[in-house]
Amino acid sequence: MASISEPVTFREFCPLYYLLNAIPTKIQKGFRSIVVYLTALDTNGDYIAVGSSIGMLYLYCRHLNQMRKYNFEGKTESITVVKLLSCFDDLVAAGTASGRVAVFQLVSSLPGRNKQLRRFDVTGIHKNSITALAWSPNGMKLFSGDDKGKIVYSSLDLDQGLCNSQLVLEEPSSIVQLDYSQKVLLVSTLQRSLLFYTEEKSVRQIGTQPRKSTGKFGACFIPGLCKQSDLTLYASRPGLRLWKADVHGTVQATFILKDAFAGGVKPFELHPRLESPNSGSCSLPERHLGLVSCFFQEGWVLSWNEYSIYLLDTVNQATVAGLEGSGDIVSVSCTENEIFFLKGDRNIIRISSRPEGLTSTVRDGLEMSGCSERVHVQQAEKLPGATVSETRLRGSSMASSVASEPRSRSSSLNSTDSGSGLLPPGLQATPELGKGSQPLSQRFNAISSEDFDQELVVKPIKVKRKKKKKKTEGGSRSTCHSSLESTPCSEFPGDSPQSLNTDLLSMTSSVLGSSVDQLSAESPDQESSFNGEVNGVPQENTDPETFNVLEVSGSMPDSLAEEDDIRTEMPHCHHAHGRELLNGAREDVGGSDVTGLGDEPCPADDGPNSTQLPFQEQDSSPGAHDGEDIQPIGPQSTFCEVPLLNSLTVPSSLSWAPSAEQWLPGTRADEGSPVEPSQEQDILTSMEASGHLSTNLWHAVTDDDTGQKEIPISERVLGSVGGQLTPVSALAASTHKPWLEQPPRDQTLTSSDEEDIYAHGLPSSSSETSVTELGPSCSQQDLSRLGAEDAGLLKPDQFAESWMGYSGPGYGILSLVVSEKYIWCLDYKGGLFCSALPGAGLRWQKFEDAVQQVAVSPSGALLWKIEQKSNRAFACGKVTIKGKRHWYEALPQAVFVALSDDTAWIIRTSGDLYLQTGLSVDRPCARAVKVDCPYPLSQITARNNVVWALTEQRALLYREGVSSFCPEGEQWKCDIVSERQALEPVCITLGDQQTLWALDIHGNLWFRTGIISKKPQGDDDHWWQVSITDYVVFDQCSLFQTIIHATHSVATAAQAPVEKVADKLRMAFWSQQLQCQPSLLGVNNSGVWISSGKNEFHVAKGSLIGTYWNHVVPRGTASATKWAFVLASAAPTKEGSFLWLCQSSKDLCSVSAQSAQSRPSTVQLPPEAEMRAYAACQDALWALDSLGQVFIRTLSKSCPTGMHWTRLDLSQLGAVKLTSLACGNQHIWACDSRGGVYFRVGTQPLNPSLMLPAWIMIEPPVQPAGVSLVSVHSSPNDQMLWVLDSRWNVHVRTGITEEMPVGTAWEHVPGLQACQLALSTRTVWARCPNGDLARRYGVTDKNPAGDYWKKIPGSVSCFTVTASDELWAVGPPGYLLQRLTKTFSHSHGTQKSSQAAMPHPEDLEDEWEVI
């Protein structure tokens, strides 16, 4: 323990947003939304372990800044206690409310350590809630106690994978605390404290005096190196007394602490919060001690109960500090100098003598003024990031308009914990905000759309030195995890202070891909929560002795959090020796396979072309992800959907071009020499597709007085979700070569990485912005190396379905409408807000009050509102955002209005429909004419002489004969397509590009195309479904609860549990007509906008892929034929694919995939054989029967279904029974009943007189006991092998090359559980146990595991994929289905890209929007 000479103050330095944001507040289970409560806590120097009410254990690695998740299989039950142990292997034990105890042996990247997550279960002895756990120091013994007094001893043999448990002691009352040392177990119960000698199995009570009252009084050993006979302990007693006793239970001293408490207890300083932690504090109960632990220095004892925490000094018999009357303290844990406690449902607070992550030496170094030497930080513990007291705020003005932060999401399967704010602890520090404390609303910096459209000339800037700002009291350091700190504006040369176009929102720069917030291997539920908010911004720091802090509590890129430094410097900067870490974050990831650079200290002087930028590479250490749900903090987990500016690849293949070398340890360019773009890919070419340079964050990387370096960090980082997207903030990627510019207009940068959407270059913008000051330019030759064939990789589907999230203006959103330039939101309280589009972020302005419905015309010229209570419709005279507005009464008794650019369609309270025509800016309303309608309507939408309506029964109608000459049209027609698909829309809207959009009651989004006035029903004979459920959770009950809260109409509902109220109201919302129809969908030329009814909405600004599963009936078969199996293979005859179909295990037929409706050919099976599995390639069909026999049918052009079956001689394999087969092009893979994997070259059964090809046995992946491989899946080109195990975990074989066709190692692929896989030549598709389908993105030769999963619409019972990624499936009723897709793009320009081999840069221009 530390010996302390001067007095120390214990306080909370900064809230643990990085930890709390990584744990979802709710999960979705089916239709139910379950609140996640935190229930248990334990900490040490390496990890923070948090138990939850859903049976999920969250483990945060403090060195890697990664959150992992582990769960108990079976029913979800609350975790009541967790206990960490760091010995040779890291272990964590958790106990639940039903008496289950599980031990997880964690994966370590260090050599010789555990490489596979393992779990041991203690079951069958405890039947009641676990209350205490204790480890032996070597991790071989675990003691667990429950609330009925049972104590179980579990012996762990980690090498053998064994865990044996036995009951060793039973007390009459609940166990309160356990501690173990030197073969002695210290037990505290509600009635007494005792010592249990584990060798002699004898018990001795501590002290002879019985307790005067029962209670949760604990005891702990006093740490120290000593033999058993010298052990001493503290035990708390009623009446503020503490015993010190020896190993025989004899009391050596009694500390009576009443006098120490008489003068009061100095409270711990807590970080200021919006709601004080003591809000809801209880009246102070009688003081008493509780559980105890030794802490900080000799003689100091930490004691706590559910109301209070006390830090006591037994030497001086005094209280050091404490927290009293707070109430609801659930769990307390301490490390050497930190106290963590869990309060209430989800508040974890850290109390310490110093900020998180700073060792005292680093702290002292930071405080030295004028220190010009670079601080060498080489260990992970040294500096996860500078904290508050070390951060000086530089910069100038702060604008004070509220901005809502975009948080991007993209479709992916992994909707777990998505937007976790995983920052290194230090990076969470709140910068001190100048003089005086400002209200939160003023701590925002936003840009108006006018600013955003200005030209931005980028130059390196010198920042004037300013004196350190003194720390101010109170709120200046307080921050709330949903707020944004202000961005300092840098002054431009010439002293004209201009705001850099850095909307704070951009800080949360959207990660538009899919978080690989992976579901853990056994995760029973998909947790969907999105908490990432921005906590701050980079501060420009000019003092050489201080560190810059980039503070973002959205999911921060691992790049900033945990990796080694790529160096870069802007031109025109003097070179200097002293250098500091850009973000103050430098983590040494010890021993991990890819991150070797961390092991060598960086030279202090790297030549003029280097500046440090941390950057993260995918950790590909084998087994590093096995069975664990690792959520890297940032891009590696949030794989984007959109190319970063100029090809930012974050996963393992960090490549710019086909010739790029992978940036692995050691492949570093010579220090100081310029690096060709093909060698280093992390270059941000700053540009924006909508016609101006993207916003740049200027990070000052300070030198000593000789100069100042500036690095523009573009925030267009994409990524996102896992279903929930994680915002990656200001991903500071850059290159050795000092340049930052746009590529030539006629080139598009692409990458050899086919699937990784990081790898695609963004076409350059049409901006005329000068780039002359940006330094040396990239030559044409560099770009011309990029092969034209790679341009075809810019397929829209890779960038499709990238959703960004925005915060709404206040309360839940009832209605959302968009025009060309503005978005309008109506909340449940009747507040109407608007914000300009598509600036860097949304700046909400209150427009009106007491509004029930709002409508706007597509151009934005017309704006109508319907008033609350009076139901009168008003038209706005001239739509101005600022200044006075005049409203004209347009029609009384209205409930819903839809506006086209020159008409208004009004549904009235009577259900009648009225029309006003000839409207314009000068004539916003006119005389109303009644239009007959056969059904009462609830919604209507009109645009470009097309009118669609939604009836109260959720049927869709369209109006025929509408034209500019006949605006009222001729007649209503029912939409047959919607009836056929049984679509039940909640709201509909007409969008640009002649589209119609609908949101249904299940939260699915659909569209139709070709909607024009002459053909209002459109071109499609079905709706196309767009995948949104991974980011937008339509929680009807929360939608209705929002209405309740807003209108205060159910005052007594709160007395019942929220879930019950929600259940009662769930149907009420969708079945009864609300006073106003929620309108949750809007489409304009900048994107598709959706609200889920909460105070948030989502926008897809790129293309969207619509899916339709087409029911195919081969000729000669009945439409009701129930197929059981479908398999696609390369056709023996010509280009294209064959489908092999069967209805049972005793039949088989084949048909060409190109003409699947033609008559199938029947294939005769071997007599008496019951087939269990098939695999096929171009020249052979392999079949496996129920006895494990293999039959081969040779296929040829002349006989595409083959002539006869040949039984394969399997005598070489002995008694092995094969259960799964996979055919590549020339290679065969098989799996046996015990999980063994076999490889064979050649698809044909050779003549038995010749040498038979040998089966080579491949060692399967290391698995926990009882888990084995069950199926193998190979790609048609022999390049990939993926396997599934008996727990539905997915693994990939790495290292497969032409020279090494069997590969070299196995890697667990986290993110989802799959019961079937199908491989094309480029990627992998998976079917989940519930029938959902997902695609793996980012699979390449260099990155065989890919990056993230992304779900597609549909639910199937069996599926297959052709070599070219066309999906075929058997649907739930047994129908044969073919997946058809249609891409919706916002501009005609994007559609040209699929026709040209080398698309012009502007073709994809509107795909991207800088947020």
Swiss-Prot record:
WD repeats lie at residues 23-66, 67-114, 115-161, 162-203, 204-265, 266-309, 310-343. Keywords: Autophagy, Hereditary spastic paraplegia, Neurodegeneration, Neuropathy, Repeat, WD repeat. Pfam families: Beta-prop_HPS5, Hyd_WA, Tectonin. Residues 379-439, 463-542, 579-637, 758-779, 1388-1411 are annotated as: Disordered. Residues 400-420 have a biased composition (Low complexity). SMART domains: TECPR, WD40. InterPro entries: Beta-prop_HPS5-like, Beta-propeller_rpt_TECPR, RCC1/BLIP-II, WD40/YVTN_repeat-like_dom_sf, WD40_repeat_dom_sf, WD40_rpt. TECPR repeats lie at residues 945-976, 994-1027, 1179-1209, 1226-1259, 1279-1310, 1322-1353. Disulfide bonds: none annotated. GO terms for biological process: autophagy; protein exit from endoplasmic reticulum. Residues 475-489, 496-542, 608-621, 763-779 have a biased composition (Polar residues). Detected in skin fibroblast (at protein level). It comes from the Eukaryota. PANTHER family: RUBY-EYE2-LIKE PROTEIN (PTHR23287), TECTONIN BETA-PROPELLER REPEAT-CONTAINING PROTEIN 2 (PTHR23287:SF16). Interacts with the ATG8 family members GABARAP, GABARAPL1, GABARAPL2, MAP1LC3B and MAP1LC3C. It is linked to Neuropathy, hereditary sensory and autonomic, 9, with developmental delay: A form of hereditary sensory and autonomic neuropathy, a genetically and clinically heterogeneous group of disorders characterized by degeneration of dorsal root and autonomic ganglion cells, and by sensory and/or autonomic abnormalities. HSAN9 is characterized by global developmental delay and intellectual disability, axial and appendicular hypotonia, dysarthria, and an abnormal gait that is often described as ataxic. Other features may include peripheral neuropathy, hyporeflexia, and autonomic dysfunction. This is Tectonin beta-propeller repeat-containing protein 2. It comes from Homo sapiens (Human). The lineage of its organism: Eukaryota, Metazoa, Chordata, Craniata, Vertebrata.
